[in-house]
């Protein structure tokens, strides 16, 4: 049997204690409540979000994600898992394999509920394609929480998300500030993600509206799944067809794959990259200077809040129906002012699909 040295053992204990302290100390968290709830034009007001200390019983939750192909959803998974553990509830975590698999997501949720799931947290593949499912859940008195992506249903119990309109708007405004009206034209290749997804259409609208009146010339949206191979091909094709491109803007996966493509094509001094949401690789890119900036929506916290909302709904306790973390745009200038553990999962975290 291999012996563990005292310093190594102590380091492990201290790391575990540190992670436990971070989990316990995530709240109160600076967030924004939307009123009226579920309104695209609702007014946002500041709120310090605090969850329940513990669940009254070991509820069984179903949690559904579009996929776990990128670090963004890994971060949501981390938030969901840690909050379920902290509250003392069980969770089955499902992933549908991609944004083309709406029917699979629906059947996974239905199967989980049939297996005894008492509340559902949904990172929706489609804003409109899950409306009937949410309606049927309400008819069965099963709370449905909309996390991250957005579902267009009045039958939802609550939403834990930020406005991806605002995320796109923040990214667009960051670029527009560098290129005011009257300055030299700059071409932007824009990759908002998979067509039809609620978060994509919202981000696209926010981005395109933010750059109006600037000297930026934004190409028509280049849609596609957020798998790395898909995004890499889209970026390669865009750079090949339009040598005038100065900026690559889009999903975190777009930004991640663009770093290597820009370097391989010797375009580091000509083409810059910006994401409209943060992942660990985007964060690392900002640190290295290969990615300019990204709004941060604290996906870990969104996952945590969604689990708390589900438990509150099951226990008939007060809940904020529409809430999300306050958005901040991160670049190299302010990177060190942001607490990493609030906005990203630990580097060592691996996907977990069950909390018992």
Predicted features along the sequence, with ranges:
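Hydrophobic alpha-helical
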Residues: 119-139, 207, 224-285
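Extracytoplasmic "Venus flytrap"
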Residues: 30-50, 60-79, 83, 87, ...
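Flexible loop/hinge segments that line or gate small-molecule binding clefts
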Residues: 25, 128-166, 177, 187, ...
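Hydrophobic alpha-helical segments within soluble ligand-binding/sensing domains
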Residues: 105, 160-186, 199-202, 230-232, ...
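Hinge/cleft segment of the Venus flytrap/periplasmic-binding protein
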Residues: 24-59, 191, 195, 211, ...
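An alpha-beta-alpha
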Residues: 61, 65, 80, 170-216, ...
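Gram-negative bacterial Sec-dependent N-terminal signal peptides
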Residues: 1-22
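Exported/periplasmic ABC-transporter solute-binding proteins
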Residues: 246-247, 255, 259-326, 330-340
